[in-house]
From Swiss-Prot:
Function: Hydrolyzes the cell walls of mycobacteria. May play an important role in cell wall growth and cell separation.
Protein's UniProt name: 38 kDa autolysin
Top-level taxon in the UniProt lineage: Bacteria
Biological process annotations from GO: cell wall organization; defense response to bacterium; division septum assembly; killing of cells of another organism
Known EC number: 3.2.1.-
Stretches assigned to coiled coil: none
The protein's assembly and partners: Monomer.
pH dependence per the entry: Optimum pH is 7.5.
Keywords, alphabetical: Antimicrobial, Bacteriolytic enzyme, Cell cycle, Cell division, Cell wall biogenesis/degradation, Glycosidase, Hydrolase, Septation
Amino acid sequence: VAVKATTTEEETEIPAK
């Protein structure tokens, strides 16, 4: 995963909070 926010590594298209 490129950016790990508060979600799991299954959601890769997430904004960096």
